[in-house]
Amino acid sequence: MGDKARRKWLVLAAWPYAYGVPHLGNLIGSVLSADVAARFLRLAGDEVVFVSGSDMHGTPIEVEALKRGESPKDLAERNHEKIKELFERWEISFDNYSKTESPTHIKFVQDFYRRVYENGYVFSDTVQLYYCPKDKIFLPDRYIVGTCPYCGYDRAYGDQCENCGRLLEPTLLLNPRCAICGSTPELRTTTHWFFDLPKLTDALKRYIEENENLPPNARNMSLQILRDGLKPRALTRDNKWGIPAPFPGAEDKTIYVWMEAVLGYISATIEYFASKGEPEKWKEFWLDPETRSVYFIGKDNIPFHTLILPALLIASGEKYVLPWTVASTEYLLFRGLKFSKSRRIGVWIDEALEVFPADYWRFVLVSLRPEQKDMSFTWEEFLRIVNNDLNDNIGNFVHRVLVLVQRKFGGIAPAPLDFADEDLKFREEILARSREVAEFMYAFRFKEALTHILWLSSSGNSYLNFRKPWELDSESARTPAFLALHAVKALAIMLYPIIPRSSQEMWKLLGYKDDIANHRWHEINEAVPPGQELPSPRPLFRKISEEELKAAVEKIEELRASRSS
């Protein structure tokens, strides 16, 4: 995993909607998972561009701004800045966190759709759309709810059922109602512009069938949608808060928020390289077929990234690299229930940082990452993971080793003597775990990677208990102390993508003066240099008592009460 075989990666996190603060499920489903990937790939020596941004347009922002008596732009900008600041506090290492209201994005979207239109993939048609006579607005997809005609779910949206994942049209819903006021809407005639998705059926089928990197759930869902038959997708909306549609005759329309935000991955990359004074370099990523683009999304976003986005990229006539894979997750629940702000179910990312450090949360969320099935967050599980895994397993091993070196060798990393069988076995485990963890990281299976990291620290504790170097004379304690320090270095590097701040602290406690991010994964193979001076040891983590946890939960409730009053 040295620098000689550098790959180019686009690490792309689904764009948070600037309607409010994301919750923990949103975070692990996209942005946090993408950050773990980006940090690992940089450690691996690859060339990485990691972007996301705030999705600022659409009816929800427009309606909320109306209620508050302010402009949609002011509301969205304020929320964007808040979300951006929160991501910084969560240690998210974006190369660029952009927004759909940026001039670069607006220009790119309009130019992009002009090309799609000129290539014959856009047509206009008169359609009947739901209109709420009470609120006096046309109701876009997400503002119509009703019963899914496929699975019977009674809270399906007009564009997609979140229960079965099927793409929908508002008129397909049974018992439709206005999501704003709950009244029954009426159908009215209006003209809209559509993306001719069915024209691209064969190209999409080839892309899905030939792409061996797509996970089974994404492949199967996409093929099922193709078998059911694709339908044209609306490109325009009647609401005013959005990017003006560039099609002739569509001067009073805006681009549908889903169909413009999904292009933000490209515009954010363009914006990033322009800010670095390299305005053409984005093409080295987006127009190079060897580039690996990975989209970190929840399972409800799969069709937009495996079908609609590839179709748009193909329709543009440019040679944009199609999604290499989607790293989709199942749902993170809160005590078995979906997160809901109105019902106070869940924890939001601003609240979380008011009670515990970001690294504690990052560690817990990766431990609970719903890679194969829905996972449930509970406060009891949070306490168990922090106390047992982070503190007692990793923290205890690291501190034991550092204290041993301080007491036996005056804080100077020792050189080894002869290696006994148990020493050789432990050294091989360090190297083997490094390879295994890297494989899971490259497969974006971070929960499993963390399990193997924990196995290494558990083995380290067992190794120390077996060798008992504190009972040996200084000469005999050299080899076990040398290997234990090697394991701590391995843990610092392997944990860096997950808990970056704590890993940097671990790095400093090993006597390194620089930033761990400047090092490479393959350096796990190298032990801490004998003679390196270590600072005085101090615990990296601490246990959380049940009383402290109870106080934290109460503090979150108090914060919510103060905000709603």
Curated annotation (Swiss-Prot):
Keywords annotated in UniProt: Aminoacyl-tRNA synthetase, ATP-binding, Cytoplasm, Ligase, Metal-binding, Nucleotide-binding, Protein biosynthesis, Zinc
One GO term of the biological process aspect: methionyl-tRNA aminoacylation
Keyword ATP-binding: yes
Record bears the keyword Aminoacyl-tRNA synthetase: yes
GO molecular function: ATP binding; metal ion binding; methionine-tRNA ligase activity
Reaction catalyzed: tRNA(Met) + L-methionine + ATP = L-methionyl-tRNA(Met) + AMP + diphosphate
Cofactor: Zn(2+)
Protein name, per record: Methionine--tRNA ligase
Recorded name of the encoding gene: metG
